[in-house]
């Protein structure tokens, strides 16, 4: 899945650059510039749909990649793992600020709700939120800085990816048995490059199918309405890949408690290398750990379902 994530990143950066050429980061123009892109720019509709749904595939791949890493004990490569978690956090930040850019109803209210969470931080919270907004509400300054972040962060992700790979190459990658694989080493090209092409095809075909046949399947219809600070949508919810965290946030009545639980749900990944006590690396021969692992997977799926 690592190679697929690399492909996702490249695809997203290319489509994103093409979109940025036609996008206007201004509250009065953002929504219309996106509409103009889909109507008047050559293949603009396709580029936009690939970019929007590419994010979903990025998250599918990263969640599978993390799950696979937990299952096979890859987190024992501590540096690689920790940089991976930082990569996940950066990706989540990028996806969040990107979702705000079309400036539809859900963009605006999503930005309002999520940035507001920073006000739960004791003492500095309120100042921090006003500093983040560039004013007393989500408005033009917020949109322009979010565009700047959304442009910058993917390159940060690309840089971190190289560091991630550098640390991985210190030890070599893990395998399903969790044992050294020195005797099985083979040249990357042509063997792995051909093997990866299969994965590329298996990811790109569903992505293109989704972008061409039902591009709005995963989006929120609320985002077809231009942002209106005076009308709150009936239900504010993020894209599906954040629903598990959003469900945790919403289920706790206390604001600070919810924010802490939301943060902890992702930051817990940093602790996993410290919690490993087994003599075996992988879960292949540990039925009890397997039960716990699949319970975790089921939990996340149920949270995602409940969150919607």
Curated annotation (Swiss-Prot):
This is Cytochrome b. It is found in: Mitochondrion inner membrane. Heme b b562 binds at residues 51, 150. Coiled coil: none annotated. The keyword Electron transport applies. It is a multi-pass membrane protein. Keywords: Electron transport, Heme, Iron, Membrane, Metal-binding, Mitochondrion, Mitochondrion inner membrane, Respiratory chain, Transmembrane, Transmembrane helix, Transport, Ubiquinone. It holds the Pfam family Cytochrome_B. Belongs to the cytochrome b family. Changing residue 70 to F: In strain: Isolate New Mexico-523. A ubiquinone binds at residue 169. Disulfide bonds: none annotated. One of its GO terms (molecular function) is ubiquinol-cytochrome-c reductase activity. It comes from Corvus corax (Common raven). SUPFAM superfamilies: a domain/subunit of cytochrome bc1 complex (Ubiquinol-cytochrome c reductase), Transmembrane di-heme cytochromes. Its main location: mitochondrion. The chain crosses the membrane at residues 1-21, 45-66, 81-101, 146-166, 194-214, 256-276, 288-308. Component of the ubiquinol-cytochrome c reductase complex (complex III or cytochrome b-c1 complex) that is part of the mitochondrial respiratory chain. The b-c1 complex mediates electron transfer from ubiquinol to cytochrome c. Contributes to the generation of a proton gradient across the mitochondrial membrane that is then used for ATP synthesis. One of its GO terms (cellular component) is mitochondrial inner membrane. Changing residue 40 to D: In strain: Isolate California-168, Isolate California-169, Isolate California-170, Isolate California-171, Isolate California-175, Isolate California-176, Isolate Idaho-1, Isolate Idaho-2, Isolate Idaho-7, Isolate Idaho-8, Isolate Idaho-10, Isolate Idaho-11, Isolate Idaho-12, Isolate Washington-899 and Isolate Washington-SOA. The lineage of its organism: Eukaryota, Metazoa, Chordata, Craniata, Vertebrata. Its cofactor is heme b.
């Amino acid at each position: 899945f690592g190679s697929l994530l690399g492909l996702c990143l490249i695809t997203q950066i290319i489509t994103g650059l093409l979109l940025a050429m036609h996008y206007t980061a201004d509250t009065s123009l953002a929504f219309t510039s996106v509409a103009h892109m889909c109507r008047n720019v050559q293949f603009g509709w396709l580029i936009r749909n690939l970019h929007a749904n590419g994010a979903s595939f990025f998250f599918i791949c990263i969640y599978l990649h993390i799950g696979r890493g937990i299952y096979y004990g890859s987190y024992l490569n501590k540096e690689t793992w920790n940089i991976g978690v930082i990569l996940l956090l950066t990706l989540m930040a990028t996806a969040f600020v990107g979702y705000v850019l079309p400036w539809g109803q859900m963009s605006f209210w999503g930005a309002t709700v999520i940035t507001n969470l920073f006000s739960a931080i004791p003492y500095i919270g309120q100042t921090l939120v006003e500093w983040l907004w560039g004013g007393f509400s989500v408005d033009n300054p917020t949109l322009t800085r979010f565009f700047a972040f959304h442009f910058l962060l993917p390159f940060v992700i690309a840089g971190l990816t190289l560091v991630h790979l550098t640390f991985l190459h210190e030890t070599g990658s893990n395998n399903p048995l969790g044992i050294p694989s020195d005797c099985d080493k083979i040249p990357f090209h042509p063997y792995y490059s051909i093997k990866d092409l299969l994965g590329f095809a298996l990811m790109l075909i569903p992505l293109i199918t989704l972008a061409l046949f039902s591009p709005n399947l995963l989006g929120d219809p609320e985002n077809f309405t231009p942002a209106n600070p005076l009308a709150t949508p009936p239900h504010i919810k993020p894209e599906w890949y954040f629903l598990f965290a959003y469900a945790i946030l919403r289920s706790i009545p206390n604001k600070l408690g919810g924010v802490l639980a939301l943060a902890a749900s992702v930051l817990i990944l940093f602790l996993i290398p410290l919690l490993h006590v087994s003599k075996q690396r992988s879960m292949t021969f540990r039925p009890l750990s397997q039960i716990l692992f699949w319970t975790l997977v089921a939990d996340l799926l149920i949270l995602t379902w409940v969150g919607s």
